[in-house]
Amino acid sequence: MKITSRELTDIFQKHVENLFPNKELKPVEITVATNENFGDYQCNFAMINSKIIGDNPRKIAEEVKNNFPYGDVIEKLEVAGPGFINIFLSDKYISNSIKKIGEDYDFSFLNRKGKVIIDFSSPNIAKRMHIGHLRSTIIGESISRIYRFLGYDVVADNHIGDWGTQFGKLIVGYRNWLDKKAYKKNAIEELERVYVKFSDEAEKDPSLEDLARAELKKVQDGEEENTKLWKEFITESLKEYNKLYKRLDVHFDTYYGESFYNDMMADVVKELVDKKIAVDDDGAKVVFFDEKDNLFPCIVQKKDGAYLYSTSDIATVKFRKNTYDVNRMIYLTDARQQDHFKQFFKITDMLGWNIEKYHIWFGIIRFADGILSTRKGNVIKLEELLDEAHSRAYDVVNEKNPNLSEGEKQNIAEVVGVSSVKYADLSQNKQSDIIFEWDKMLSFEGNTAPYLLYTYARIQSILRKVAELNIGLNENIEIKTENKIEKSLATYLLAFPISVLKAGETFKPNLIADYLYELSKKLNSFYNNCPILNQDIETLKSRALLIKKTGEVLKEGLELLGIPILNKM
């Protein structure tokens, strides 16, 4: 299915090139009209090309309009202000385009060469996921879905933290203070407990730190017993993580943890030294940057031979470069890691690895009492957050529809609760800090998941009533857009793929949320002003098909945010 703005762009581009030959014109730009009174789309061609053409922009716009080859797509053009061209789509084009909704959109104009690696979530083994993991996990999942929708070949990678000094401490804690019953019941929770226990005991007996280093060395050397324990910790942790990923509807193609790259880091450092990118500095291997880069030096190997996160991340890029036909890498982490990514991105550029790299950073989540801190022991676990959302959503569902079966209430509560948490995050600018307010998140009014889910369920309720009348909705129905409110809804449906495209280009899922909220408002205005069921048969069919296609767009948009739909609420 052609994207309306692209189709209009092609029509205008061909027209102005014929109208103004032998001119190096700036490309035509078509945007959705900001005010419905000024058409469906707008073009500023005359404004941006007046100097090139050598004439007044208003006069240029009039010339474009007066010589325009009208066809089935455009009904009329109007010139406004200093030279804007307002575009009004034909009713026939709108109707035919809406009936095509459900077909794949044509994004062939994008440069989709090579794979896109999206690196997100990345929890640390033997630690339960907490609220701080939410943003990377669900924003990364949404960006993965958006890129797949746009036709890119995506690899979603969970770069888990499965290596480091904590494993020596865990092994000491496991052997000295493990509660086997608790471990069997919830391994990762018990591992967290013994890790804290180790820290407490090590304050009293510092020799435990030496013991932990010795146990870690055994893991690093591949000693059988400790290696077996290390792998067990990973397996048990992933079991718990995958339960949460299933609940959040998050999916990964690969789980290459930090340990996977251990054997590659020596070669990375050697290459950096051989290319004189890294130099010896008091026994350590360090990369110094140009003053204009405004970056601190980056240590890639300490004087004791140990490697750092930067070394591991450079090795990761090298592996991906050599393994995949990779064109782009996208990383999702919080804002605190910005300097780290600037450093290692610059190093990979210095190595001549021509790959697009993006660090998508985000703010933190807050509640009324401020930032959640693990040091204070009050960090909210992700499972606890989702359980609380479920419980609160259940109370709302039970109050609004007490006649539902218990199974229906529980299912709706899970969808509404988890979706409310996800949408409260995804509907915000990712670089802003998020303040969770339960009443606001679970409200059926405003820009919330319950409002969008209810809008979709309402569509399905009306379509069920249409079906009970034995009225079929097929592609032969002409969708009428004579009514201003009908046309507003209909033309807005055609803007959906552009909102997805912009969300992908800017890594902002909130642009899709903004679109869906505006679409839902237009739909509810349509409900209130354009009756469906008690109308003549042609009007009924037209309006029923229009809301059916609206439901399809709403569903597709929610899926891009990782939010499932409900047919009943």
UniProtKB/Swiss-Prot annotation:
<keyword id="KW-0547">Nucleotide-binding</keyword>
<dbReference type="InterPro" id="IPR009080">
    <property type="entry name" value="tRNAsynth_Ia_anticodon-bd"/>
</dbReference>
<dbReference type="InterPro" id="IPR035684">
    <property type="entry name" value="ArgRS_core"/>
</dbReference>
<dbReference type="Pfam" id="PF00750">
    <property type="entry name" value="tRNA-synt_1d"/>
</dbReference>
<protein>
    <recommendedName>
        <fullName>Arginine--tRNA ligase</fullName>
        <ecNumber>6.1.1.19</ecNumber>
    </recommendedName>
</protein>
<keyword id="KW-0030">Aminoacyl-tRNA synthetase</keyword>
<keyword id="KW-0436">Ligase</keyword>
<dbReference type="InterPro" id="IPR036695">
    <property type="entry name" value="Arg-tRNA-synth_N_sf"/>
</dbReference>
<dbReference type="Pfam" id="PF05746">
    <property type="entry name" value="DALR_1"/>
</dbReference>
<keyword id="KW-0067">ATP-binding</keyword>
<dbReference type="InterPro" id="IPR014729">
    <property type="entry name" value="Rossmann-like_a/b/a_fold"/>
</dbReference>
<dbReference type="GO" id="GO:0005524">
    <property type="term" value="F:ATP binding"/>
</dbReference>
<keyword id="KW-0963">Cytoplasm</keyword>
<feature type="short sequence motif" description="'HIGH' region">
    <location>
        <begin position="123"/>
        <end position="133"/>
    </location>
</feature>
<dbReference type="InterPro" id="IPR001412">
    <property type="entry name" value="aa-tRNA-synth_I_CS"/>
</dbReference>
<comment type="similarity">
    <text>Belongs to the class-I aminoacyl-tRNA synthetase family.</text>
</comment>
<dbReference type="Pfam" id="PF03485">
    <property type="entry name" value="Arg_tRNA_synt_N"/>
</dbReference>
<comment type="subunit">
    <text>Monomer.</text>
</comment>
<dbReference type="InterPro" id="IPR008909">
    <property type="entry name" value="DALR_anticod-bd"/>
</dbReference>
<dbReference type="InterPro" id="IPR005148">
    <property type="entry name" value="Arg-tRNA-synth_N"/>
</dbReference>
<dbReference type="GO" id="GO:0004814">
    <property type="term" value="F:arginine-tRNA ligase activity"/>
</dbReference>
<keyword id="KW-0648">Protein biosynthesis</keyword>
<dbReference type="GO" id="GO:0006420">
    <property type="term" value="P:arginyl-tRNA aminoacylation"/>
</dbReference>
<dbReference type="InterPro" id="IPR001278">
    <property type="entry name" value="Arg-tRNA-ligase"/>
</dbReference>
<dbReference type="GO" id="GO:0005737">
    <property type="term" value="C:cytoplasm"/>
</dbReference>
